[in-house]
Amino acid sequence: ALIPTAACTTDADGVVVIRGNRILAAGDKASVKIPAGARESKCSGGFVTAGFQNSHVHFVGAAWDDAGKKPAADLARELVAMLTRYGYASVFDIASDRDNTLALRARIERGELAGPRILTVGLPLFPPNGLPIYLDHLPREFLNRLPQPATVAAAVAVVGDNLAAGADGTKLFIITPQARGLQRMSAEIARAAVDESHRRGKLVFAHPTDIDGVAASVAAGVDILAHTTHGVETPWPDALLKRTISQGVSVIPTLQLMGYELKKENVPPAVTQRLVAASVEHVRSFAAAGGQILFGTDVGYMSDFDPTEEYRLLSKAGLSAMQILASLTTTPATRWKKFKTRPASTS
């Protein structure tokens, strides 16, 4: 088997030593000690990589309801369909019913069902009266639980409660589309939420919506933009691009999402192509200038689980195969400093 790495090296005569469901060693045949009596399986023509991380997923919808009690076989089937069949060994859920997602994670960690390592931001923060129109399809009971802090103190309390409950980060919706216009999170509230998260050693995601949202996110000190600026045809200003990169802000492009959303709205193909191309150019400029890309697809919100189109669009944005592999493996591992705890997957 070939064992490629994001550093562009490949073990052409690679071997993988597996005991039970754990990988004990992987590398060149000459350097890996094979235990006596091991059964050998030929895997010529295949590839083995580090387990992938999808840094933008959501455990929302009927498939995940009551995850603490739902039959394990049902949940395992959904995890395979949405995630593990595509090589995701780790996922970051960046908005869901926190307690339900934590219950799902606990069952995986107890060994009740096979699934990826789950990180979650739990309940995201929105501007006051700022739930976006594209969440209207979700149950009212869930929407009523989504925090919309109106003061700095309230935002700090929400972040503290969320992280204390077991969340692994914070997500801010900086600007949200409404039926009429946009709703914006105040700079003071955004900064306070970021500062409290950082004080507790956690990273912050932001949903920017547009270029003003990117600027506000960067000014607040967020760590990761959950999307590029879909639907925006103008380039990011050079000064904003440079500041975003100099502050170490990562971007999760979610390029496949743009076409998915426009198809739902029956937007003419020519318009869709133009808007998707604009998103691709935003990512091209960011990556070419040295910006850090994290792979993510928004599955869970998006019902098209197959990431093939995301790979194609990232390639169109100028990322090499090894850069895309890095965005799935070594880059998130570096970002979360989890080199020694990340599982591996094969394909």
Identify the function of each model-found stretch.
Residues 59-74, 129-149, 176-184, 229-235, ...:
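Acidic/histidine-rich helix-loop elements
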Residues 66-114, 146-168:
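Alpha-helical scaffold segments that flank or form the walls of functional sites
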Residues 199, 273-347:
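His/Asp/Glu-enriched, well-ordered alpha-helical/loop segment
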Residues 51-57, 91-92, 118-123, 170-172, ...:
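Hydrophobic faces of well-ordered beta-strands that scaffold small-molecule active sites
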